[in-house]
C-alpha cells in the first residue's frame, strides 16, 4: 500500500464510511508513507513520483498505458471496497501496538487491544449495513479483503500475547525482588563466620605457643628439683582411668575461660576482645567444650547439632560452620604440634606421648607430667601421670 487511504482525496479515508477519523487521532498528519523501492513484483502505484518511470517509458506507449490502467483499476477496487476502512483500522492498531507505550493507568491505553477491535467491528457492521452492503460484486476481491483482515487480526492477537508474557515476566521478577529474602541473616552469618574464624585463629595460635613455653618452665623446674615432682604437686598420683577423667575436667575448665598467658598486657587483651565474633562467649565455650570432649571424632551429628543450637541459642547453620572452622583452626594445629613434639623428642613411647597443655583461669599452668626420664620434655601424659601446677 504505497500511499495511505486517507491521503487520497477521492476516497476520503475513514470519513467515507461514517467512522470519525479522530477516534484514534491522525497518526499521518505530520508524516507520509515512504516509498518502497525493494518490491519487484510490479511497478509502483504512482510511477510519476519514482525513478522507475524510466522502465515504463522504455516500453511501448500502448503496453505502458494498459498496465497503468490495470493497476489503477485494481487500486480503485481495493480502496473502494466496503471492507477497506476496517482493514486500514486494524492495520493502524497493529502499528500502535508496537510503537505506543503501554501504561495501564493512562486513558485510551487499550486502543490497540483485540477487545477494542471487536467493538470496532460491531460499530462498523451497524454503520455499513445502513448505507451499503459489506461485499462487492467481485468475489475474489471480497475473499482477498477478508483474508487480509484475518491476517492482521491474528497478528494483533500475537502482539497481545507477547505483551502479556512480558508483563507476566516483569511482575514475577519484581515480586521475587520484593520477596522476603533473608539477606540480613545471610550477612550476619557471614560476618559471624569471619569473626569466629579470626577468634579461632587467635586461640589456636595460643594453643600452639603454649607447649614451648611450658617446656621451658618444665626444664627449669626439673633442674631445680632433680627430676622429682615439685612440692606443689601434693603427691596426687592416679591410675590411667582416674587420670583420663581428671584430664576431661581440666579441659572443660580450660574451655570455660581460655587464656594466652599474656593477660597482663592490656593491649593484647583488648585486641583479643575486639577480634571476638558476634557469637556469645557462653555459646563459644559450650561448642569448644563439646569439641575437646570429642577430639577423636569432632563431627557432631544432626541431632547433636540441633541440641547444641538449642543450648547456645545459635542456628544450626552457625553451629555447623563453627565446627567446620574449629576442625581446621583448632584440632589440626594440635595434631601437628603433637607430631612435631614426637619427632623432636625421643622415639615414640606409648607410656609418654607428648600432648599440648592448657591454662586455667587463675593463670596457673596445668601440665601432665610422667615421672622418669620423659619429665624433661614438659607436657607428657603417661600411665602413671600426675598433676603438676607450675
Swiss-Prot record:
Expression tissues: Expressed at low level in normal immunohepatopoietic tissues, including the fetal liver. Expressed in a subset of myeloid leukemia cell lines, with the highest expression seen in those with a megakaryocytic-erythroid phenotype. Also expressed at high levels in the cerebellum.
Sequence segments annotated as region (Interaction with DNA): 299-329
Pfam families assigned: Homeobox_KN, Meis_PKNOX_N
SMART domains reported for this sequence: HOX
Annotated ranges, domain MEIS N-terminal: 108-192
Regions of compositional bias (Basic and acidic residues) in chain numbering: 190-202
Composition bias type Polar residues, residue spans: 203-213
Subunit structure: Interacts with the N-terminal region of PBX1 to form a heterodimer which binds DNA including a cAMP-responsive sequence in CYP17. Also forms heterodimers with PBX2. Forms heterotrimers with PBX1 or PBX2 and a number of HOX proteins including HOXA9, HOXD4 and HOXD9 where it acts as a non-DNA-binding partner. Also forms heterotrimers with PBX1 and HOX proteins including HOXD9 and HOXD10 where PBX1 is the non-DNA-binding partner. Heterodimer with DLX3. Heterodimer with HOXB13.
Disorder noted: Restless legs syndrome 7: A neurologic sleep/wake disorder characterized by uncomfortable and unpleasant sensations in the legs that appear at rest, usually at night, inducing an irresistible desire to move the legs. The disorder results in nocturnal insomnia and chronic sleep deprivation. The majority of patients also have periodic limb movements in sleep, which are characterized by involuntary, highly stereotypical, regularly occurring limb movements that occur during sleep.
Protein's name in the database: Homeobox protein Meis1
Origin organism lineage: Eukaryota, Metazoa, Chordata, Craniata, Vertebrata
Gene coding for it: MEIS1
